[in-house]
Curated annotation (Swiss-Prot):
UniProt protein name: mRNA-capping enzyme small subunit
Originating species: Swinepox virus (strain Kasza) (SWPV)
Free-text function comment from the UniProt entry: Catalyzes the last reaction in the mRNA cap formation pathway.
One annotated Gene Ontology cellular component of this protein: virion component
S-adenosyl-L-methionine keyword on record: yes
Amino acid sequence: MDKITRNIREGIHILLPFYENLPDISLSLGKSPLPSLEYGTNYFLQLSRVNDLNRLPTDMLSLFTHDIMLPETDMEKVYDILNIKSVKSYGKSIKADAVVADLSARNRLFKKDRELIKSNNYLTDNNLYISDYKMLTFEVFRPLFDLSSEKYCIVKLPTLFGKCVIDTIRVYCSLFKSVRLFKCASDSWLKDSAIMVASDIYKKNIDIFMSHIRSVLKSQYWKDSNNVQFSILKESVDKEFINKFLEFSTSVYESLYYVHSLLYSSMISDNKSIENEYQKKLTKLLL
């Protein structure tokens, strides 16, 4: 419990290793690889609680999260930490300290309004912006199309789970000599989003990677039609890297599981009111 409180109050970060050898790139657009136990069990352990929340009516979810859904200011926090004064995104041809892509559903928890679903057996889709590996699209590599003299490449990841997110980060670890992941205290601790900060470009591998990507896309420039699910590697990345990534993501998911458990217990509490012991614990933890 002390560890979870510390994670939420102080945030979590990790520096990932640099790999001089670029993995074998095999880009395919249109479909994400399915989740695999090889890439960590934390998602599967957490999914049952996410599904419990997913089937509850969204008006009720809004009520019980209204006071604990603080504005997500983690990107601004990272800018402050790194002394970034200017950023560019979406192809803007300006000089900046960083090129940025935000793939997260900022300040949003669910995708559409819906009523109660009576049991998890009737769930057909994930209506929450939580633990949804399909949210990661090829836009995660868009900053590379816009990169020129910027010191940093920053991506807000919508999720930390799935083969594709680990494969993507592994590729970035060969394109830049420094890759860090942050789950800031000022991010939402209801969602499994995080920030990747890459710096110190390794030009040799960037050139090889972008040549392959542009060949597959049949274009030198970014197109919005590229913003779809994708697969970037055929083979699994090495176990050493998976374990290093899981050091970070497991700490995030352990904290989220506790938060989600408190929220779910509050929403189904006997007194049918937002004034209950679970909500008080949740409020104390997140505010």
